[in-house]
Amino acid sequence: MAKKVANIVKLQIPAGAATPAPPVGPALGQAGINIMGFTKEFNARTADQKGMLIPVVITVYEDRSFDFITKTPPAAVLLKKAAGVEHGSGEPNTNKVASVTKDQVKEIAETKMQDLNAADVEAAMRMIEGTARSMGFTVED
């Protein structure tokens, strides 16, 4: 028989750097999860992606067991890394802070494809380009 789901917790945690300190500890503690067990497993699973922000969906069951799914880093994080900037523009319509190439956008779209609601890579590229424009980046051919 399937376990009954008690709670679903969504967090964004730096890869390989989950600690029991806030915000991870309190969120997991409220859900009744073994915090050290989660942090060790998460850090082991994401050790190869150090420095990236990883979204994670934790499913907590009534018997206090859990499992989790890691997703691909947010498009904004991947775009900032590709452009080599710290953060996007506060005024994206008037102040452009960086530029990314179509090749970089395609690479990001292929990375994010499993998490995007897109039929093909072209549609995913359009989504990533929209994110880039809203961050004050220009997309060059």
From Swiss-Prot:
One of its GO terms (cellular component) is cytosolic large ribosomal subunit. One or more lysine residues are methylated. InterPro entries: Ribosomal_uL11 (IPR000911), Ribosomal_uL11_bac-typ (IPR006519), Ribosomal_uL11_C (IPR020783), Ribosomal_uL11_C_sf (IPR036769), Ribosomal_uL11_CS (IPR020785), Ribosomal_uL11_N (IPR020784), Ribosomal_uL11_N_sf (IPR036796). Keywords: Methylation, Ribonucleoprotein, Ribosomal protein, RNA-binding, rRNA-binding. Transmembrane segments: none annotated. One of its GO terms (biological process) is translation. Pfam families: Ribosomal_L11 (PF00298), Ribosomal_L11_N (PF03946). GO terms for molecular function: large ribosomal subunit rRNA binding; structural constituent of ribosome. PANTHER family: 60S RIBOSOMAL PROTEIN L12, LARGE RIBOSOMAL SUBUNIT PROTEIN UL11M. Belongs to the universal ribosomal protein uL11 family. Forms part of the ribosomal stalk which helps the ribosome interact with GTP-bound translation factors. Part of the ribosomal stalk of the 50S ribosomal subunit. Interacts with L10 and the large rRNA to form the base of the stalk. L10 forms an elongated spine to which L12 dimers bind in a sequential fashion forming a multimeric L10(L12)X complex. HAMAP family: Ribosomal_uL11. This is Large ribosomal subunit protein uL11. It comes from Limosilactobacillus reuteri (strain DSM 20016) (Lactobacillus reuteri). The lineage of its organism: Bacteria, Bacillati, Bacillota, Bacilli, Lactobacillales.
